[in-house]
Regions:
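Conserved alpha/beta-hydrolase
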Residues: 109-131
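Short alpha-helix in the alpha/beta-hydrolase fold that links the catalytic acid
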Residues: 294-303
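Alpha/beta-hydrolase active-site loop
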Residues: 137-158
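Active-site glycine-rich loops that stabilize anionic/oxyanionic intermediates
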Residues: 95-98
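Short beta-strand/loop motif that positions the catalytic acidic residue
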Residues: 278, 284-286
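Catalytic active-site module of serine/aspartate enzymes centered on a nucleophile-bearing elbow/loop
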Residues: 314-350
Length: 350
C-alpha cells in the first residue's frame, strides 16, 4: 500500500483520535463528494439533554493550491473563499493521523460565516507527499518552523490585497494545537490568535482508565518501535491507526507522554522558555465526551502559555472528532471569542 492509499472512509465518525493521536487514518486524501453528516447527538450534562439536529451538508470541492517545502515535499492546501470581503483569515491544521479533507464541514461553516479559510496538512499526512523513512525524519520543530509559516504565508498571499493585512487566526485540532503552541513561540509567528479543539498534553498522569493505560504503556512501545525502524509503520501493526509517521515525531511525542516535557530535537530556540513569553491570545477548547483530551490535559497545555491561553469546556457531547463534522458549536464559540478580543475580554485571568 503506497502513501496515498491508506484512506479510511472520510464520511464516518472516527473510531479513535486523541492527544495521543487522532486516527481517522494518516492519509486523508479522498472524500465522498456528497457525504451526509453523522446522526444526532445528545447534549451533555447541564444542557438539558435536548435533541440537537445536525445541519445537512453537501461537500463542495474547494480550490486547491500547493506549496513546496524545504525537504522537497509538497503540501496541498484547501482554499475556501467567502462571498465578499473576508472578515478574517482562518488557517486550519489537523490532528495526528488525520487528513485535511475530514474537516470540510468546519471549513465550509466558517466560509459561510464570512471567513477566508485555508486548510493545510501536517507533514507526511493526507495529501502531503513527505514519506517517513529512517533517513527522512522530522518532528515538532520542523513542522512548527517550516509547515506552519508556509501555510500562514500562503493564506496571506491568497486572501489579502496588496498592502492589506487581515486578521489571521490558527484553528488547530489535537496534535495541530500542540505544534501551534510552539509556532506561536517563534519569532516569525504572524497570527492574531489561535483556537484549539481537543489539544492538550499527552502526559499520562492527566488521564484515567483506558487512556491512562494506553499512554503509560503504549507510549514506550511506540518509542521503541519508531527507534528500531526509524519510523512508525502503517499496516496491521498500527493498532492506533496513525498511519506511517516520522520516527522523530513519534519519539518526541512518546517522551512528552511519559514525562510531560516536550523537547523538540534540533530546535533552534528554547521552546519551553519562549512559550512563557507568548502574548498572542489563545483559546483552548475541549468538548464533552472527549476521552482523548481531558480538561486536565488541555489545561496542562494552556499552562505552558501562561500569558496567552485560557481553557473552556463545551458542554455538548461532540467528543474528540465529531465537532468537526457538526461544527456549529465550535464556530459559535470562535465568533464569540473574536468579539471578546475586540473589547479586550479574552485574555487569560491574571
Amino acid at each position: 500500500m503506497n502513501q496515498h492509499d491508506e484512506q479510511a472512509n472520510p464520511g464516518a465518525v472516527p473510531r479513535r483520535g486523541g492527544t495521543g493521536g487522532d486516527a481517522v487514518n494518516a492519509r486523508g486524501g479522498r472524500a465522498n463528494h456528497a457525504a451526509e453528516m453523522p446522526g444526532d447527538f445528545v447534549a451533555g450534562p447541564g444542557a438539558g439533554h435536548e435533541r440537537v439536529e445536525p445541519v445537512a451538508r453537501t461537500r463542495e470541492e474547494p480550490e486547491m493550491i500547493e506549496r513546496v517545502l524545504l525537504d522537497g515535499s509538497v503540501t496541498p492546501m484547501q482554499i475556501h473563499r467567502p462571498k465578499g470581503k473576508p472578515r478574517a483569515i482562518v488557517v486550519f491544521f489537523p490532528g495526528f493521523g488525520m487528513g485535511a479533507r475530514y474537516y470540510w464541514p468546519m471549513a465550509q461553516e466558517l466560509r459561510d460565516r464570512g471567513f477566508a479559510v485555508l486548510v493545510s496538512e501536517l507533514h507526511g499526512q493526507g495529501g502531503q507527499t513527505a514519506r517517513a523513512t529512517r533517513g527522512h525524519q522530522w518532528g515538532y520543530h520542523e513542522i512548527a518552523s517550516v509547515d506552519y509559516p508556509a501555510a500562514v504565508a500562503a493564506a496571506r498571499k491568497e486572501f489579502q490585497e496588496p498592502g492589506e493585512r487581515l486578521p489571521l487566526y490558527l484553528m488547530c485540532h489535537s496534535m495541530g494545537g500542540q505544534i501551534g503552541s510552539l509556532y506561536l513561540a517563534r519569532p516569525e509567528a504572524d497570527v492574531d490568535g489561535m483556537i484549539t479543539i481537543g489539544s492538550g498534553t499527552p502526559h499520562y498522569i492527566r488521564f484515567t482508565g483506558r487512556e491512562y493505560t494506553r499512554l503509560c504503556w503504549g507510549g514506550p512501545v511506540m518509542w521503541t518501535v519508531s527507534t528500531i525502524l526509524g519510523y512508525w509503520p502503517a499496516g496491521p501493526w498500527d493498532l492506533a491507526r496513525y498511519g506511517r509517521q516520522s520516527g522523530r515525531h513519534v519519539r518526541e511525542w512518546a517522551m512528552f507522554a511519559r514525562n510531560g516535557r516536550l523537547r523538540p530535537t534540533q530546535a533552534d530556540i528554547d521552546y519551553s522558555r519562549e512559550m512563557l513569553k507568548v502574548t498572542t491570545p489563545v483559546l483552548m477548547l475541549t468538548c464533552d465526551g472527549d476521552r482523548d483530551c481531558t480538561p486536565d490535559s488541555a489545561m496542562d497545555l494552556a499552562s505552558r502559555l501562561p500569558a496567552a491561553a485560557r481553557f473552556e469546556f463545551i458542554d455538548r457531547r461532540l467528543g474528540h472528532n465529531r465537532w468537526a463534522r457538526e461544527p456549529e458549536a465550535v464556530a459559535d464559540r470562535f465568533e464569540l471569542w473574536l468579539e471578546e478580543l475586540s473589547v479586550g475580554g479574552a485574555r487569560p485571568p491574571r
